[in-house]
Swiss-Prot record:
Function: Transcription factor that promotes early floral meristem identity in synergy with LEAFY. Displays a redundant function with CAULIFLOWER in the up-regulation of LEAFY. Required subsequently for the transition of an inflorescence meristem into a floral meristem, and for the normal development of sepals and petals in flowers. Regulates positively B class homeotic proteins.
Superkingdom of source: Eukaryota
Entry keyword Membrane: no
Gene, per the UniProt record: AP1
Name of the protein described by the UniProt record: Floral homeotic protein APETALA 1
Main location: nucleus
PROSITE patterns assigned to the protein according to its UniProt record, in alphabetical order: K_BOX, MADS_BOX_1, MADS_BOX_2
Residue numbers spanned by region Disordered: 180-206
GO-annotated biological processes: cell differentiation; flower development; positive regulation of transcription by RNA polymerase II
Pfam families: K-box, SRF-TF
């Protein structure tokens, strides 16, 4: 006899229900993978357990891309066939769509942070790992580019500072050279002003007759001693007669 048709109904035993759910879920994911490989189709499968736990499967394409594609397609068709009276309904559906998208993004964010990974299959974990590796490559590439640009900017500033220092050093040397030349010129002028004037030549000097009186001549001191060294003593001599006029007078008398 052939096997009878199994009646589908809710399994009352919680343990049996959980075991059946795990087996059927694995078989369903396997069938989805087979159809995606054999038929080259994009498949997205979402399953929620009776406790609200999420299980999903997608092909090599990202789950978000498949859902966005489905939403665009279904929303465009609904817009074509929906009457104007269903505008409020469309807004409600749009709200639900955005809400589901936010929940999906939050879940992916938790996955990227390494949280809530228990419900993910090995295939999903592998896809997540590939996405993280790609993100790390982009991050490292961007970081290296920023560091390279920063080094080039610092080198450019260093070159500009070196050129400025060279120009300032050249200006300082030129200024010192000018100051040194001015100092030498000033020293030469001061040296020429401090030198005594040269004495007049002796052979061209003419003695005036009246200058002969400054030559020493014999004196007759009748008031006291004469000291040539002390000028004050000369004032104490009331009578200092020169012998030269007397001598000249006597010679004149004898001659007459």
């Amino acid at each position: 006899m052939g096997r009878g048709r199994v009646q589908l109904k809710r399994i009352e035993n919680k343990i049996n229900r959980q075991v059946t759910f795990s087996k059927r879920r694995a078989g369903l994911f396997k069938k989805a993978h087979e159809i995606s490989v054999l038929c080259d189709a994009e498949v997205a499968l979402v399953v929620f357990s009776h406790k609200g736990k999420l299980f999903e499967y997608s092909t090599d394409s990202c789950m978000e891309k498949i859902l966005e594609r489905y939403e665009r397609y279904s929303y465009a068709e609904r817009q074509l066939i929906a009457p104007e009276s269903d505008v409020n309904t469309n807004w409600s559906m749009e709200y639900n769509r955005l809400k589901a998208k936010i929940e999906l993004l939050e879940r992916n964010q938790r996955h990227y942070l390494g949280e809530d990974l228990q419900a993910m299959s090995p295939k999903e974990l592998q896809n997540l790992e590939q996405q993280l590796d790609t993100a790390l490559k982009h991050i490292r590439s961007r970081k290296n580019q920023l560091m390279y640009d920063s080094v080039n900017e610092l080198q450019r500033k260093e070159k500009a500072i070196q050129e400025q220092n060279s120009m300032l050093s050249k200006q300082i040397k030129e200024r010192e050279k000018v100051l040194r030349a001015q100092q030498e010129q000033w020293d030469q002028q001061n040296h020429g002003q401090n030198m005594p004037p040269p004495p007049p030549p002796q052979e061209h000097q003419i003695q005036h007759p009246y200058m002969l009186s400054h030559q020493p001549s014999p004196f007759l001191n009748m008031g006291g001693l004469y000291e040539e060294e002390d000028p004050m003593a000369m004032r104490r001599n009331d009578l200092d007669l020169s012998l030269e006029p007397v001598y000249n007078c006597n010679l004149g008398c004898f001659a007459s």
